[in-house]
Amino acid sequence: MYQVLIVDDEPIVKIALRSMLDWGSLGFHICGTASNGQEALEMAERMHPDLIICDLKMPVMDGIDLIRTAKDRSMNCEFLVISNYEDFNYVRTALVLGASDYILKVSISPEELTTQLQKIK
């Protein structure tokens, strides 16, 4: 099973992502959730997730700094970015830093998320 850490400062988004799919049938397990990048880094160092699904705009540490710091620390995990933030430069930075892809929160669907997960797997 691929271990997944969900990182978003909006509780409703974390709940929606958890309930959107039958994660186990796709070969994934949600090992935890975090509310900001700093909390996610601490959890990732303990849990070693295979995938971190993260927002870009969060308090304390945003998604860009989370990806950058995780890569600097040689954490071996994939990143899938979800956000309402549509600024191309911000998204491009996440992709250049190594995010696998980017999904807009407003358009996320079970089908789109499943497609992204299958690409990562």
Positions of predicted regions on the chain:
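Alpha-helical/coil-rich non-catalytic "connector" segments in signaling and regulatory proteins
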Residues: 1-121
